[in-house]
Structures are given as C-alpha cells and as structure tokens.
C-alpha cells in the first residue's frame, strides 16, 4: 500500500551519543524523512522508595532522552520541508500511575509532556506530532509472564492506528491516541 524504505541500525538508545550518531546516520542515508516513530522503551518494575538506585535514570535515558535527542536531529529536516509526522510511543502509564510502576510512569509522563510541548512548537511548521498511549501490548518482553496472550493487545493494532493517523489531510492531526486491551488495563 505504501512505498516505504526502512533501514536497520544497531543502537543503544539509552546512550545519547549513540542516539545522536544514529540520527546522523539516518540523515546521511535518507535525505527526506516523512515519519519518525520514537518507540524505544524499557520497563523495570518497582516502587519509588524500594527500587534500586539508577532505575529512574535508566528509564528516563531510554524512554525520554532517546526521543528528545533523535527528534532534535530529525525534525529540522521535516520543518525545512514543511511536512512530516512524529509519533511518540508513550503509555497509558503516561496518564495513570499504577502500583509497581513508579519510575516507568515518571518517564512516560515526561515523554507525554515532551510530545505536548513539541506539538505546540511545531504546529505552524506543517510537522504533526502524535502521542500514542497504548495499554499492555504483546511483545517478547511479556514472554514468561503468567498471562494469556489474548489478554494483551497486538502490536499490529498500534501500527494500524499510526497508519490511519498518517492518512489524514494536512489540515488535521490526531494529538493523542489512547488504546487499551478490551478487558481493561492489567
């Protein structure tokens, strides 16, 4: 349906210098970038007062700073063309705190805040910004968890929502997409 070109790179998204170099690599191999999906994320369960030192920093580095640094590299190309769409994959944990999700929720609240500021800053440039806030979605990180796979959403559902948001006219944007499993949050 779409004429899409994708390239793979191996990057530790928690290390800002690697993220910035990744951005440079993308720019040098793709002179025109229409869509950026900031989807790097990590989750370490724990309560704020009981979690190991460094967990907050680890999650903020991956969940927030990777999107921040990559966007700062890629978005200027979009602004130059007055066209583009940035999707930040947040979480329902961006709007609702839950037990044992302390620093993860903090990092995702921050990513949603980043998305809102970015949307405000870019709205007159033709570049759209959409925050995607999914609930529990199946991935390999759920392997071994005592839950039926059917209890989780499928990643394809998130991809379809992103695809649909891309199909809108230039005068319309979806600011936030909240999607949860049919049976509710875990």
What is the role of each PLM region?
Residues 10-21, 53:
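The beta1-alpha1 cofactor-binding region of Rossmann-like NAD(H)/NADP(H)-dependent oxidoreductases
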Residues 40-44:
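Conserved NAD(P)H cofactor-binding loop of Rossmann-fold oxidoreductase domains
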Residues 47-48, 55-60:
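Substrate-binding pocket helix/loop in short-chain dehydrogenase/reductase
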Residues 49, 98-102:
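Active-site loop immediately N-terminal to the catalytic Tyr-X3-Lys motif
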Residues 71, 107:
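Active-site helix of classical SDR
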Residues 91:
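Residue(s) in the substrate-gating loop at a strand-loop-helix junction
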Residues 124, 131-132, 147-186:
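C-terminal helical subdomain
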């Amino acid at each position: 349906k779409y004429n899409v070109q994708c390239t793979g790179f191996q990057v530790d998204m928690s290390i800002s210098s690697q993220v910035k170099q990744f951005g440079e690599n993308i720019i040098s191999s793709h002179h025109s970038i229409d869509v950026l999906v900031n989807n790097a994320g990590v989750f370490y369960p724990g309560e704020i007062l009981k979690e190991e030192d460094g967990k907050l920093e680890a999650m903020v580095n991956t969940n927030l700073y990777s999107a921040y640094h990559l966007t700062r590299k890629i978005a200027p190309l979009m602004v130059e063309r007055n066209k583009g769409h940035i999707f930040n994959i947040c979480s329902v944990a961006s709007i609702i705190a839950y037990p044992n999700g302390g620093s993860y929720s903090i990092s995702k609240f921050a990513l949603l805040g980043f998305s809102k500021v970015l949307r405000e800053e870019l709205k007159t440039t033709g570049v759209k910004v959409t925050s995607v806030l999914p609930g529990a979605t199946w991935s390999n990180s759920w392997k071994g968890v005592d839950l039926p796979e059917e209890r989780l959403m499928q990643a394809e559902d998130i991809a379809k929502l992103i695809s649909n948001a891309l199909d809108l006219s230039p005068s319309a944007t979806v600011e936030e997409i909240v999607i949860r499993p049919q049976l509710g949050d875990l």
